[in-house]
Amino acid sequence: MNEDPLFLACTRPAMFAGVTMEAMAFNVMATSILFILTSGFTMIGLGIGLHFVLREITKHDHNQFRVLFAWLNTRGKQKNLNRWGGGSTSPLRLIRTYEELNR
């Protein structure tokens, strides 16, 4: 299998200082809320520390936060996930293999 070096560059999300924009938005919101609640400038240091943690998370896979948000938008919002046993809210039985279709 040949790897195309341009493929990753074309699909890479927008980043700020090594962190995706989704993670940066989370960092800014969390740091701002903590700064407002505590009125202390030490929370800015906590935000910088959180930035380095988020940078280590996105170092190996830059789409990890997009996958997390996609999961939250699909399966994370379902209230009856345990009842149906999956991501679908349909009460119909899911046919999983081709052999089950021929029965």
Swiss-Prot record:
Q: Any S-S bridges, and between which cysteines?
A: none
Induction statement: During the interaction with the intracellular environment of host cells.
Q: Transmembrane helix: present as a keyword of the record? A: yes
Q: Where are the transmembrane segments?
A: 33-53
Question: What are the subcellular locations of this protein?
Answer: Cell outer membrane
Record InterPro entries? T4SS_VirB3/TrbD/AvhB (IPR007792)
* Keywords, ordered alphabetically: Cell outer membrane, Membrane, Transmembrane, Transmembrane helix, Transport, Virulence
Q: Provide the membrane topology annotation.
A: Single-pass membrane protein
Would you name any one GO CC term? cell outer membrane
Superkingdom of origin organism:
Bacteria
State what this protein does: The type IV secretion system VirB/VirD4 is a major virulence determinant for subversion of human endothelial cell (HEC) function. VirB-dependent changes of HEC include massive cytoskeletal rearrangements, a pro-inflammatory activation by nuclear factor NF-kappa-B, inhibition of early and late events of apoptosis, leading to an increased cell survival, and, at high infection doses, a cytostatic or cytotoxic effect, which interferes with a potent VirB-independent mitogenic activity. These changes of HEC require the T4S coupling protein VirD4 and at least one of the effector proteins BepA-G.
Quaternary structure annotation from Swiss-Prot or TrEMBL: Interacts with the 17 kDa antigen protein that is encoded within the virB locus.
Name the family the entry cites. Answer: Belongs to the virB3 family.
The molecule here is called Type IV secretion system protein virB3
**What organism does this protein naturally occur in?**
Bartonella henselae (strain ATCC 49882 / DSM 28221 / CCUG 30454 / Houston 1)
